[in-house]
Amino acid sequence: MELLTGHGLWPVAMFTVILILLVDLLHRRQRWASRYPPGPVPLPLLGNLLQVDLKNMQYSVHKLQQHYGDVFSLQMAWKHMVMINGLKAVREVLVNYGEYTADRPKIPIYEHGSLGPKARGVILAPYGPEWREQRRFSVSTLRNLGLGKKSLEQWVTDEAGHLCDAFKDQAGRPFNPSTLLNKAVCNVITSLIFARRFEYEDANLIRMLRLLEEALTNISGFIPEILNTFPVLLHIPGLFDKVFSGQKTFAAIVDNLLTENRRTWDPEQPPRGLTDAFLAEMEKAKGNPESSFNDQNLRMVVNDLFIAGTVSTSTTLSWALLFMIQYPDVQRRVQQEIDDILGPGRSPEMADQARMPYTNAVIHEVQRFADIAPLNLPCITSRDIEVQGFLIPKGTTLITNLSSVLKDETVWEKPLHFHPEHFLDAQGCFVKQEAFMPFSAGRRACLGEPLARMELFLFFTCLLQRFSFSVPAGQPRPSDHVVLGVLKSPAPYQLCAVPR
């Protein structure tokens, strides 16, 4: 009877509560297990590491999607992740659940090689006040410097003229256009950041692009994936500096440019470029330890803009010229539209884009078919979410497969073929498709998308206005084989640029 009264009742109540909680937890685990996305059975310790090709994750993801469906799970050692495929599921994750999928997981190789504890940047920064402050600053600064206005457009138009002059210097001889395209796009970025451009033969520009390519090569492939999976290896003395040597050297070049910019900065004058604007914000934020405007973050933001803004656009342009020599009928039709709208002498302007539906469709199809960034940067859930009927717990790493959207067979008429008509209606008017998302979507969509669109249209149209491109005599038609890295690049090829 003592158990039912006084102190004796307390242990019984505690035992009952604990039992109820344990039973509830068991049921919750069973529910999650039954509704958690399916996937290959993980091995002890290794998870699914031996069941995927870390050098070609896109292919592995495609094969697993065919077997498990649009939403499936992987376990990389002890790290759980869910792959999201197809337009419907990707939009659900990035747009419908945008507030809860905007954060980034920790990426050990970036944290170990950080430019400092306050160097968050924009691309890989955690979702929070600092990220919002820097994204807002970047967007507003680009707008103030002329994005969507004539000033920035004139910079790009002038650079397109320099690029065409460099193509003309090839005198119709075979050459690989990628190097010149890299230089032109890099000059647009340096104009935005430092309000300066380099001559194409400038040793500093050549070295900067070489180191940028090396840095991007360093962070892609098998070794970085292993180091991210087993970060304890990063503490092996000298390993990081050996594997990622290009990153540190590239950062040193950027530091030199920042030092020169700071030396010539006049705070009384309007900002010449993004660095001036950032320095002005640093002055305003003095004494505020919570501000994200500091020297370390300036370095990181500039590195982010170089990496995100240079190689992606130049790689897309390289694919565009490859497709023009592979599909000469498309090239001729683009040139006919250019001649009809611009004539032989007037340089293209962004205002012309609305009157050039076929050219616009071709540029969009280049981006869709080239598919240069098949797997999006990882994000992490900040709460439990339900996607396509599957329950995904808080703290799960998600990777959205943008390639599965750009090649979604339920959306595109000819997903595996180069077909500009994907973006034209029956009357020949341009139509943007919902499944066109090479810049991602949602809160983490690429902030440089408007600039990239401007560069693609002005560079591509200017080149097709002034040159006809062809396969060099005696050479086979180039293949569309890819070189895998951070981005999908075309295998090296040559073309002839004959002045029109």
Swiss-Prot record:
It comes from the Eukaryota. Heme binds at C446. It is found in: Endoplasmic reticulum membrane; Microsome membrane. Its EC number is 1.14.14.-. Keywords: Endoplasmic reticulum, Heme, Iron, Membrane, Metal-binding, Microsome, Monooxygenase, Oxidoreductase. GO terms for cellular component: endoplasmic reticulum membrane. SUPFAM superfamilies: Cytochrome P450. GO terms for molecular function: heme binding; iron ion binding; oxidoreductase activity, acting on paired donors, with incorporation or reduction of molecular oxygen, reduced flavin or flavoprotein as one donor, and incorporation of one atom of oxygen. Belongs to the cytochrome P450 family. This is Cytochrome P450 2D28. The gene is CYP2D28A.
